[in-house]
């Protein structure tokens, strides 16, 4: 499950990076002012860095959740009162 969550985090970060790149290109194409072009590039770099940080934070959180589940025993299976297989 952790790898699935990590893959989802990586995909989300990838989408955010792509959005940042496309937005930067659009902003650079619509202006002739070098200062605005530089600001668009800096904004893109900030968004890309934030996406990477979010991905790393999510990955660390998933690892902590997995570690916590292993030590507390959550996620184990058992049998209910009716004898049916249940998951706690």
Curated annotation (Swiss-Prot):
Classification via InterPro entries: LEA_1
Biological process terms in GO annotation: embryo development ending in seed dormancy
UniProt biased composition (Basic and acidic residues): 14-65
PANTHER family: LATE EMBRYOGENESIS ABUNDANT PROTEIN 46 (PTHR33493:SF2), LATE EMBRYOGENESIS ABUNDANT PROTEIN 6-RELATED (PTHR33493)
Name used for this protein in its record: Protein LE25
Region Disordered: start-end pairs: 1-88
Domain of life, source organism: Eukaryota
Induction: By abscisic acid (ABA).
Annotated coiled-coil segments of the chain: none
Tissue expression per record: Accumulates in developing seeds and drought-stressed leaves.
Family assignment from sequence similarity: Belongs to the LEA type 1 family.
């Amino acid at each position: 499950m952790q790898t699935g969550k990590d893959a989802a985090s990586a995909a989300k970060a990838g989408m955010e990076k792509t959005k940042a790149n496309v937005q930067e290109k659009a902003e650079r194409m619509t202006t002739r002012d070098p200062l605005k072009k530089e600001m668009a590039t800096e904004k893109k770099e900030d968004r890309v860095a934030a996406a990477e940080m979010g991905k790393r934070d999510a990955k660390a959180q998933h690892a902590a959740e997995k570690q916590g589940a292993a030590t507390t025993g959550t996620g184990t299976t058992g049998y209910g009162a009716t004898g049916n297989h249940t998951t706690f």
